[in-house]
Amino acid sequence: MMPFDIRVGQGYDVHALVPGRKLILGGVHIPHDRGLLGHSDADALLHAITDALFGAAGLGDIGRHFPDTDAQFAGADSRVLLREAARRVREAGYEIGNVDASVIAQQPKLAPHIPGMVANIADDLGLPATRCNVKAKTNEKLGFEGRQEGIVAQAAVLIWRGAIADAQD
């Protein structure tokens, strides 16, 4: 019998806000005069969660699996990347326990969009929404986030493998 193995992963991502791009966070299009600059759709929230999953499983990071130097990922939908990351984590023998994430942005206000983000993350990871949490924070007008030059996302995930008692959600 395999011993119980519980792990925590932490993810971080940041992208600059620029004109002429859509703002997508948690797979949700958010109306704004600027969007995030990046090789893919630049969804900082999903990138942070993806990085946390890979890190928890000891599988490296998002750049190792989906390099921004690879043309096949140009404009990629980060929800597709998140689903693939979850598949690889499960292929390594782990179950995903929960996700807790924060998005730091002065503007736009994200609270109205959080239920959609949570629904997308839960759907992509095959988890109940009760195990996915997204928080929106400002940086109190400090730093590049406060000056509305970019958006930061941070995420923590719990994964496990081995015998575990049935848990109730």
UniProtKB/Swiss-Prot annotation:
Q: Does the keyword Metal-binding apply?
A: yes
| Pathway in which the depicted protein is active | Isoprenoid biosynthesis; isopentenyl diphosphate biosynthesis via DXP pathway; isopentenyl diphosphate from 1-deoxy-D-xylulose 5-phosphate: step 4/6
Give the reactions, separated by semicolons, that this protein catalyses.
4-CDP-2-C-methyl-D-erythritol 2-phosphate = 2-C-methyl-D-erythritol 2,4-cyclic diphosphate + CMP
Pfam families in the cross-refs: YgbB (PF02542)
| Binding residues for 4-CDP-2-C-methyl-D-erythritol 2-phosphate | 13-15, 39-40, 61-63, 66-70, 144, 147
**Which InterPro entries does the entry link to?**
MECDP_synthase, MECDP_synthase_CS, MECDP_synthase_sf
What family is this protein classified in?
Answer: Belongs to the IspF family.
Q: What is this protein called?
A: 2-C-methyl-D-erythritol 2,4-cyclodiphosphate synthase
The organism encoding this protein is Cupriavidus pinatubonensis (strain JMP 134 / LMG 1197) (Cupriavidus necator (strain JMP 134))
